């Protein structure tokens, strides 16, 4: 099997093929690039999933449940007006390339300029990327992806956590510091107010990310 299996990530066996047939999940282990992704992804016969890549290793994970999907949608609606005022554009999941053999598909992103149909977005064009944390993505969203985004020079990383069983919503906005690591720029829980002037003005209660 060629996929990297992080905590809770779907373990995907290579599809059965005739002996000797080329199997990208096997043959391309550790050497994935955007060019190869364009050629071989999505894998025929697999359910719809996210394909991300860390140092050439393909990472396959399920799409988010309704809680995170709604939270990401609300973040898009909250950020779109102030971001557009600066000439930026807000997007749901897209391919953000962080290196020759690295890419992520964040739950939402703010680009410095319109993507205009591009399939692969250079990390240099991303002002902010955001992830909604789920049990299957906790390690990646808290450790791996922030580290890769910081290394790529993306100035802001936003982490969103929601739970209906706990009536909990939390937003952490990280900003790239002088030493190349992310530092907490703004943070708030449901019932409080997240307020920031950078990268664009935002002021709202994280509880808005929970459905009524």
Q: Where are the predicted features?
A:
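Gly/Pro/Ser/Thr-rich low-complexity, intrinsically disordered segments predominantly at protein N-termini
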Residues: 1-212
